[in-house]
C-alpha cells in the first residue's frame, strides 16, 4: 500500500520549521520521512534543514527532472526531490514543507495528499517575523498581506480538504494536535518501530 504525502503549508513565521523539527522523532515512529527542500538561498539563512543551491543550479536540476514539485515564491525557488515518489511507492509516508499557492499543483500529482495549513494570529506572526530579522518592515508587511489571502476560510485559493492547525500558542500543544490529526487520517505506526 502506498504511503501518503503530508503537505504542510503556512505563512513564513507560522512555525512550520519548528513543528517539523519537534515532530521528527514521532513522525519516524509513524513511518513518515521528512523531506529536505532545495532552495535558492544558503542553508544557513533558511532556518530549516534545507539544501541551498544557486539559481543556476536550481534551474539545471529542474531541467533534469530532479524535482517532484517545484515553485517560486518571495523571490526564491523551492524544489521537492523526485525521490519522494519512490518513498511513497514503498509505503513510506512523506512530510513536505509546501506552498499554499501551489497546493493545486501538488494535488494534481498526489491526489490523496493530506493538506494541512498551519495558521497563526496576525500579531503573533508579525512579531515572529520581526524577531527573526531576515526581512525589512516593508517585506514583513508584504508577507502579512499575502498571508491574509490564505485565511482559515479556505475558499477558492486552497480548495477543499484542507485541515487547519493553529500555532499561535505553545509548540507542544500544536505538536500534540498535529500528531492526533495525522493518526485520525490513517497515518499510523509501522510494525516494529518504536
Predicted regions located by residue number:
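Pre-Walker A (Motif I) flank of P-loop NTPase domains
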Residues: 2-6, 91
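P-loop (Walker A) phosphate-binding loop of NTP-binding proteins
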Residues: 9-11
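Post-Walker A helix-loop "phosphate-sensing" segment adjacent to the P-loop in P-loop NTPases
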Residues: 25-34
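ATP-dependent small-molecule kinase phosphotransfer cores
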Residues: 37-94, 100
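Small-molecule kinase domains that catalyze NTP-dependent phosphoryl transfer to phosphate-bearing small molecules
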Residues: 134-184, 190-194
Amino acid at each position: 500500500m502506498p504511503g501518503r504525502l503530508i503537505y504542510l503549508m503556512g505563512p513564513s513565521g507560522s512555525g512550520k520549521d519548528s513543528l517539523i523539527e519537534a515532530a521528527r522523532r514521532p513522525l519516524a515512529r509513524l513511518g513518515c520521512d521528512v523531506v529536505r527542500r532545495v532552495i535558492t538561498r544558503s542553508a544557513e539563512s533558511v532556518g530549516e534543514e534545507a539544501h541551498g543551491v544557486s539559481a543556476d543550479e536550481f534551474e539545471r536540476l529542474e531541467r533534469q527532472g530532479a524535482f517532484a514539485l517545484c515553485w517560486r515564491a518571495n523571490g526564491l525557488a523551492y524544489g521537492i526531490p523526485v525521490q519522494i515518489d519512490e518513498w511513497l511507492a514503498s509505503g513510506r509516508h512523506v512530510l513536505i514543507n509546501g506552498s499554499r499557492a501551489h497546493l493545486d499543483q501538488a494535488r494534481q500529482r498526489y491526489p490523496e495528499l493530506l493538506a494541512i495549513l498551519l495558521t497563526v494570529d496576525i500579531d503573533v506572526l508579525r512579531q515572529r517575523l520581526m524577531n527573526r530579522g531576515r526581512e525589512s518592515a516593508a517585506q514583513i508587511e508584504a508577507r502579512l498581506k499575502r498571508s491574509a489571502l490564505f485565511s482559515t476560510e479556505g475558499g477558492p485559493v486552497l480548495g477543499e480538504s484542507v485541515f487547519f492547525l493553529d500555532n499561535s500558542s505553545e509548540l507542544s500543544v500544536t505538536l500534540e494536535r498535529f500528531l492526533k490529526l495525522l493518526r485520525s487520517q490513517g497515518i499510523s505506526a509501522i510494525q516494529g518501530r518504536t
